[in-house]
Amino acid sequence: VKTLYYIDTDLYRYYIGRADQSVNEAVMIRRVDQQLLVTRLMIQAYKSDDLKRLDRKLAHCMFNYVTMMMTISTILLTLDGSDAALQKRVDIWRYLKAENPDWYAPIRYGSVATFVNFPGEFGRRLSIGNYRLARRVYKFN
């Protein structure tokens, strides 16, 4: 981008409180495939070699953004709980590991994603409990 123009015009008006809003947990779970698509595109766009050419602060910002996307995708798929959703959860982590191995361990084991990605039935219940606690503390959704 070489030139940017600002136009002081509302292009979209967001009404708070509608049941079908994208921040509604049930709606987010229904639309998780869109979330996964964007997450995959982010992982693909910021591979290790590409990051070396970016400004250090921008690379760190993108790492944090992918971490957030992985965390959200993981908990939404866990909340869904269906066999298909749980397989998608495994698949997105495998995709991250295959496409960007340098990011896999720091995101999986060294970030907030750790607290929503425990294995097994008990681990899934613990992950959902952690999510519900964070939701109460930070007042999101």
Residue spans for each PLM region:
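Short, charged, amphipathic alpha-helical segments
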Residues: R56-N64, L86-V90
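C-terminal, non-catalytic tails of nucleotide-sugar-dependent glycosyltransferases
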Residues: Q34-H60, P101-Y104
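Nucleotide-sugar-dependent glycosyltransferase catalytic core
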Residues: T3-V38, T78-Q87
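Amphipathic alpha-helical repeat scaffolds of TPR domains
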Residues: H60-L76
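Generic structural signal for hydrophobic core residues of well-folded globular domains
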Residues: V1, Y46, S73-D80, V137
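Membrane-interface aromatic/basic loop that binds lipid-linked glycans or pyrophosphate carriers
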Residues: L79-N141
